[in-house]
Amino acid sequence: YYIEKDKSTYKPEDNDSELLWKFQTEPNEQIILKIGLSSVSAEEAEANLKKECSNQSFEQIRTNARIAWENLLGQIQVETSDEDLKTSFYTRLYHACQTPFTINDYSGSYKGSDGKVYKSQQLPYYHGWSIWDTYRTKYPLLSIVCPTEYKHMISSLAELYKQGKPRSATKAEPFLTTRTEHSIITILDALQKGMFDGSLDELLPLMLKEAEDISNDSPDKALERGYDFWGVSELAGKMGNKELKKEFSLRSKEY
């Protein structure tokens, strides 16, 4: 992280896991802190802050954020006389759109789930995953609400496989993330919609391993395993691999 402050008298206490900031204020005094973040280094965090908002006031940043959210959420118009229902809908849409989010620095650098530093040459890199169960409705919703960004999300998800994607968060995660089961189904859905144009040649073997790793020792896991096997079958068919398609189509019914 990197912090710009409006007064030099604020002295933070920093250790490996937390930042403690103590300060004295007069009545009605405002404190302005600008914080830049990076998954790579403090130097990258400083560059991000200076590039994005160093010359903007708090009010400018808040106004720009409000406009950006209104433009995104306003794509869906709700017709109802019940204002509570309308508020409920837009609140949930707002929550759904908060993740995943871009984590690459302005230089293109980002840290992967394996702890290594990568460089995104063209596309923004997304992180902050929670796919288990939300793959059913949230991600199809994002494909409608923000299709351009969604393509980048799916490309980032494909890159996650190349970093050795586990089902749960690793100790080296660059930002908050949780479960990523059923990424197979998420990528298949994007492919069916023409929203993923990456190569499956490298991905499919990694997906096979992930699907095989789901145990078959309870009814719910058997169903989840079967769904991923069906996804593998469909992806194999897209690649023209008829034998693999047939094999995993049969295995998808093991439940």
Residue ranges and their predicted role:
Residues 1-126, 159, 166-167:
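Acidic/polar, glycine-enriched structural segments that form the non-catalytic walls/loops
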Residues 78, 123-127, 232-243:
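General secondary-structure propensity
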Residues 91, 95-98, 186, 251-255:
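Alpha-helical scaffold segments in carbohydrate-active enzymes
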Residues 127-236, 249:
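Aromatic-rich carbohydrate-recognition surfaces in CAZymes
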Residues 227, 239-255:
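Catalytic cores of carbohydrate-active enzymes
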